[in-house]
């Protein structure tokens, strides 16, 4: 029985129970406009956008790091991708989003290692910089993705792209040292360093991988919404939190060996909750309350004090 409670099957059982629990609550409260098969498929399609970002955040969150420039990079990379798509079509769109996102991730990792200040401070500063750059690049004009370039706006394009991202993460965690070393650094950075792990190198890799996935998320985001507007004043901050909640599901369920599945299903659970409140006619501010409350609960359940921890 003890081994079953640490198995992936037990983890899946908990996740599916949570899905059924929240679905049943909202289906009971508002049966007429919630939870049809079409609705569920729509919830899933919106949730996989955040799941991709959640997969990227996993690489740094397990090391105890945070990145508040994710939302700003989504906006900036989306704008760059849309502008390049006007001249180079799908190639410019995909490479613009993913390439721009990855380069920004490398820059963030380099600055974090060089400045030696907490990741929150570095990324908040870069968030402000990226927001301003996005306004400059966009020229103050809303960027619209051409209709002929919207393959990733819905099924099957969005599912294929997100699926490739999930497979890529599975490959990294299963067949490379990156996942193991990131976990080791998060458990005890000093011990990991004494074991010969190049801590700075893998933190840089973590940020690069995060923003590679952010680039993919940018493709899905601007395809789904078809437009992107550059805003300043920390307006992109709200884009950070929903993928982060999926990441915390992954961190909480990694003990069952199911981090990727937990991120995907966790984001689906969040989508059910959000859309359930919409079906009830609750004001949009309720979503912010739910987001904040969910973050507090998940962080409380997953955060643990570690001996030998350092300022992140």
Residue spans of the language-model regions?
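Cytosolic-side transmembrane-helix boundaries in multi-pass membrane proteins
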Residues: 1-24, 167-169, 187-201, 277-312
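Single transmembrane alpha-helix segments in multi-pass membrane proteins
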Residues: 21-29, 36-86, 246-257, 293
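Transmembrane helix-bundle core of multi-pass membrane transporters
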Residues: 115, 119-176, 204-205, 225-233
